[in-house]
């Protein structure tokens, strides 16, 4: 993944800089997300690494995307096709989203809980994280019954393990040392 990120970063940065300059960050986010989904489609994926000439591949890809991709987005697709990089479009989209979140002072946090969190609990977690991180927080909630109780919160390098299984594990380590 690190190698893909290294290759994809210049494309994502160029697209992001262009989007900011033209006040079109949200439309570029939608466009790259859609194009990324197209590139991951099982019918399209084999063509990205196939024997089609870059101009044919770009034309086909743009036709499949239709009106979801504007002229500047089509230019990005053409450049990536010429360089044999359409296969990393999903990584470009992810990096673009990271640039967008940084620019908008937003961060995503993964919250794993033993049971489904109520909207009030989600709001409390969101408010606490926003204070701690000084950013707007978007929660991605999931359920893992093996936690027994509590939550695990991950955002970037921050990991908060408030799960019962995590506490039991730490207690076990202390007792064994």
Swiss-Prot record:
GO terms for molecular function: proton-transporting ATP synthase activity, rotational mechanism. Belongs to the ATPase delta chain family. The keyword Ribonucleoprotein does not apply. It holds the Pfam family OSCP. It comes from the Bacteria. F-type ATPases have 2 components, F(1) - the catalytic core - and F(0) - the membrane proton channel. F(1) has five subunits: alpha(3), beta(3), gamma(1), delta(1), epsilon(1). F(0) has three main subunits: a(1), b(2) and c(10-14). The alpha and beta chains form an alternating ring which encloses part of the gamma chain. F(1) is attached to F(0) by a central stalk formed by the gamma and epsilon chains, while a peripheral stalk is formed by the delta and b chains. The gene is atpH. PROSITE patterns: ATPASE_DELTA. It comes from Shewanella frigidimarina (strain NCIMB 400). Keywords: ATP synthesis, Cell inner membrane, Cell membrane, CF(1), Hydrogen ion transport, Ion transport, Membrane, Transport. It is a peripheral membrane protein. One of its GO terms (cellular component) is plasma membrane. This is ATP synthase subunit delta. Its main location: membrane. It is found in: Cell inner membrane. F(1)F(0) ATP synthase produces ATP from ADP in the presence of a proton or sodium gradient. F-type ATPases consist of two structural domains, F(1) containing the extramembraneous catalytic core and F(0) containing the membrane proton channel, linked together by a central stalk and a peripheral stalk. During catalysis, ATP synthesis in the catalytic domain of F(1) is coupled via a rotary mechanism of the central stalk subunits to proton translocation. This protein is part of the stalk that links CF(0) to CF(1). It either transmits conformational changes from CF(0) to CF(1) or is implicated in proton conduction.
């Amino acid at each position: 993944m690190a190698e893909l990120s290294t290759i994809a970063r210049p494309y994502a940065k160029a697209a992001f800089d262009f989007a900011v300059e033209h006040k079109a960050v949200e439309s570029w986010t939608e466009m790259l997300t859609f194009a990324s989904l197209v590139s991951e489609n099982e019918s399209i994926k084999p063509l990205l690494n196939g024997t089609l000439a870059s101009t044919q591949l770009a034309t086909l890809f743009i036709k499949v995307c239709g009106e979801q991709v504007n002229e500047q987005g089509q230019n990005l697709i053409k450049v990536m096709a010429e360089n044999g990089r359409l296969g990393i479009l999903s990584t470009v989209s992810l990096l673009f989203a990271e640039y967008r979140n940084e620019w908008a002072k937003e961060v995503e946090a993964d919250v794993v809980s033993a049971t489904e969190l109520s909207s009030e609990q989600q709001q409390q977690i969101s408010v606490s994280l926003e204070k701690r991180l000084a950013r707007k927080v978007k929660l991605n909630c999931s359920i893992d019954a093996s936690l027994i109780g509590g939550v695990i919160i991950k955002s970037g390098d921050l990991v908060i393990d408030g799960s019962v299984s995590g506490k039991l594990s730490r207690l076990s380590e202390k007792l064994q040392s």
